[in-house]
């Protein structure tokens, strides 16, 4: 069955007229949602801890900032954009005790609703608008008159206006310029986690790291190894984005194509491991492991961060990336992203 996709003419901004939208958190997605909605004429308030370093960022950009409790008490729509592991505490302590009857609760990722960490009462509409790109790209594309695609879902619809509200929000974000694909909280959560763990992060990162180690352990120069297993990956992914796997293949040499076809690194054993990890996502095992570690102060998470931030490939990358003139514009994007992430984003509403 073909996916249902909505575009610009399918959303009605008048649905948000007279309504106040609270954006909880001002990290990567938070700043993009707040600014895009504000520039679309929506009445926006940002909810943050009074001591959050993000308060100054938001105020400098002309946004109204209040505590999470105050913002929640006056909002008709509450978009929760704090990190997954903090959302349930923010909900229990600041949002649920203050939320107006019938106010809508929104998310950009289904994690806490799908796994039951947040359970709004049945009188609250619950919807999702999840951009398929980082916040600084969502903001940049909006400012350029374009948009980043989103996936959208409605989990609770007590009044029957859930989809109209969802599409109005997506339009205000600029997303309907690109398109909004209908999904469910379950599908978005499970596929998003699967993609991160098995392809985008846990797959690609491990391939790059291991490929680099195999070459350098065999005596090849680290700089040459970096070019072959990391640098060229970006160009190949760009070709995939433009024309799929086929364009990436026919853009390469016959030698490269043949090596692709006969490669045995990614095989049926890999598929079985992917299926195992999908099962852990589906049955909630991964979510419980992550949340339990976070509740304990994230000792395992911090240990892994330290371990992988010191991989050998990271000692070579900075020097070589400085050689690429076309990376100069990307540095600005990286700086912008970093200013809204890392320690500031993690501390935003705790």
From Swiss-Prot:
User: What are the recorded Gene Ontology BP terms?
Assistant: isoleucine biosynthetic process; L-valine biosynthetic process
According to the UniProt entry, what is the EC number of this protein?
Answer: 1.1.1.86
- Give the residues the record marks as binding substrate: 253
Which pathway does the UniProt entry assign to this protein? Amino-acid biosynthesis; L-isoleucine biosynthesis; L-isoleucine from 2-oxobutanoate: step 2/4; Amino-acid biosynthesis; L-valine biosynthesis; L-valine from pyruvate: step 2/4
Entries under PROSITE patterns matching the protein: KARI_C, KARI_N
Which positions bind NADP(+)?
26-29, 49, 52, 54, 84-87, 135
This protein is called Ketol-acid reductoisomerase (NADP(+)) 1
**Record organism:** Bifidobacterium longum (strain NCC 2705)
